[in-house]
Amino acid sequence: MSLAKTPSIAAQAPVGRFHHSGQVAAYASLSVEGVEVAMRRYLGDGVKRVLVPMWLKSDHVSDQRGNPKASVVWQGTYEAGEASPTWLFSDEARDKGADAMLYSSRSRPELSHVVIFDTACLSYIG
C-alpha cells in the first residue's frame, strides 16, 4: 500500500512523540519548510516520499506551539524504559477532547507541526 495514496493513515509505529498504547496519531507539518526540517533525519533510508497537501478541519485543536517541553528529544527517555515526557501534552489534549495538537519544531521553533488524533478531520486537497 502506498501511503501517498492514503495520506490520512495514522502512524504505524507503536510509539511516537505524541502516541503510545495503541493511540491514533498522524503527523504533519504546516509548511513545506517544516516538512523538510522534520524529515531531514529520515532522508537516506531509501524510502521515496512525496508531499501531500491536506486540510485539517476541527474546532478542537490544542496549541502547544512555543512550549519547548513539547518538542524535546523523546526517544532516549523511552528507550531507557520511561514514558516520553511529550506524552503528557498529547494525553492531556486527548483527555480534553482535542482532535489534533499544534507544536513547534524542535530544531526550528518558528516552524509548526501538527499531530492529528482523529484522522477523520483530514481531507486531501491535492
Enumerate the predicted regions with their spans.
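Active-site and NAD+-binding cores of ADP-ribose-processing enzymes
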Residues: M1-S21, Y42-G126
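Short active-site loop/helix that positions an aromatic residue
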Residues: V32-G44
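Short His-Asn-centered micro-motif
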Residues: A28-L30, Y103-S104
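A short, exposed loop/beta-hairpin motif centered on an aromatic-Gly-Thr core
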Residues: H20-S29
